[in-house]
């Protein structure tokens, strides 16, 4: 990454070249702590306990195959990203980052600008999905 006048920007995170959704990506995620894990660790996730997360990280939890809502979110994410780009005029791409100081700190980012100064988290809730299907319009 380059900063002012082409000088390198010191970042706390290294680029991890993985395609999100692959087996390799899932293994990488499971071998560290990411943003999605934080609410679980804090006891703020009503669907997963810290003990469940620990079993996941140890590889001993019952494998979760996902559900219809997750499948919809995954399917809509590329279109939501395009819509964000059209509105904001900022190009973003999925990205994986890992702390260069604490390699267990990880981020699987829905959208990151090449400059590194814009991060997008995409959520496609069911009510938004229904409105989108009915109106045939991507929400703004």
Summary of predicted features, one role per range:
Residues 1-75:
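Charged, glycine-rich intrinsically disordered N-terminal tails and low-complexity linkers that flank
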Residues 62-63, 68-140:
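Mg2+/Mn2+-dependent nuclease catalytic core
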